[in-house]
């Protein structure tokens, strides 16, 4: 079998009924390197949801900007997961020209009335932040208490400071959506440790100040009930008024 025919076979397998077959194809194509990109890009429009997700992972892993146009087109997918992953890939690949399309995708997300903590909204906001098109309000005190995460768009804080950070963000008119708890391994990688059992929502019929206070109070209640052992850190998701 020639290399070209092997690439073609693996690309077809990305859209296989079996997710195991599709994932095997994804890993094989990634291992083949940039030579597979043109074939994968050409096949993406005809793929189903899972095949497109596998393709997005290939594009991200290879880090090749040739995938930019197809990723931008996927921001219009009927699948919210495909839209989210495409947005995140554009951020990962530092595709600055995708900013207008990402802004339109986020406006469409807002117009649908989705909860701001929905994963699609999170992904698009992260991409816009990564590309310098969204300003995150991070108060000086909160910034000073951060621990290094390797990603300025994804800060982490020691759990012992969680309540203080929630208060600080609210004092600067930021609404805390949720937080998650992580364990940092000896190699610097983070491992999910848990999340709060308390959920809360914003209400678009309320004033922004009322939403901020509501989120602060629930986040503080949630913070009281979680593990604050040494070595644990928190990631916090928050938004400003223009994000709602």
Regions found by a protein language model. Name each.
Residues 2-13, 34-45, 64-76, 95-111, ...:
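Amphipathic alpha-helical scaffolding segments comprising HEAT/armadillo-like alpha-solenoid repeats
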Residues 17-18, 47-48, 78-79, 109-110, ...:
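Short inter-helical turns and helix N-cap capping residues of alpha-solenoid HEAT/ARM repeat scaffolds
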Residues 25-28, 55, 86, 121-124:
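Conserved hydrophobic register position within alpha-solenoid helical repeats
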Residues 117-136:
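Eukaryotic acidic, Ser/Thr-rich intrinsically disordered low-complexity regions
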Residues 215-244:
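Amphipathic alpha-helical binding modules
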Residues 32-35, 53-54, 84, 152-201:
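Amphipathic alpha-helical interaction modules
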Residues 21-22, 52, 83, 114-117, ...:
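Residue-level detector of extended alpha-helical repeat arrays and alpha-solenoid scaffolds
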